[in-house]
Amino acid sequence: MEKRNPRSFDQVETWVFDLDNTLYPHHLNLWGQVDARIRSYIAGFLKISEDDAFRLQKDYYRRYGTSMRGLMIEHGMQPDDYLEVVHQIDHSPIEPNPALGAALEKLPGRKLILTNGTRKHADAVMRRLAVHERFEAVFDIVAAELEPKPSPQTYDRFLAMHGVKPERAAMFEDLARNLEVPYGLGMTTVLVVPSGARVVLREEWELEGHDAPHVDHVTDDLVGFLERIASARNDAG
């Protein structure tokens, strides 16, 4: 699935990946566990019903990038306890993915994680996938000074901290809105989408933007996509 005249990967030397629902498939519903814990946390923190907490959670997620950011801005919440509680989930649905590890290894250059989650959660996911040795570093929500994607400041902090040249980088994401700023900075952008009927697990707004001008490439097969990139780069010498 390609748009007309997408940016290529010929110049890419840094490969930047989102974590959840990008490195592992959405149908594992790992984020569903986090989602439920966020809802429960909001209900307890604000002393409201689970239904009201759910509506507030989704509203804040869409408006602020994360529910946490909304709680901080609207209610003055301190994030430390929240971050610890909502990421206490069962990572066992994730199985080792040697094909993903091999595909990442073939890509020439650095590989970095840019996530709105915590480093602890990212480490757990990467170890379950058996790809933790493929990544140089994780830039998490704490490194972002608690300001989530798609905030432009978060990308600026990430690029500065890791010395990434955006015009020589590619960004892989499962949310199109999180690719708009990277594209504007000069990065080649890839939207990773669920395959087949599993797309129904997504919220409608999350599925928007597949045809947006800031999305260079769309794939529902990350491993195959990376293998094709690596093969093309190898053939080009």
Regions found by a protein language model. Name each.
Residues 1-12, 105, 112, 118-119, ...:
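Asp-based, Mg2+/Mn2+-dependent phosphohydrolase catalytic module
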Residues 2-17, 22-101, 120:
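N-terminal helical cap/lid subdomain that shapes the substrate entry/recognition surface
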Residues 29, 58-59, 94, 113, ...:
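Residue-level marker of alpha-helix boundaries and capping positions
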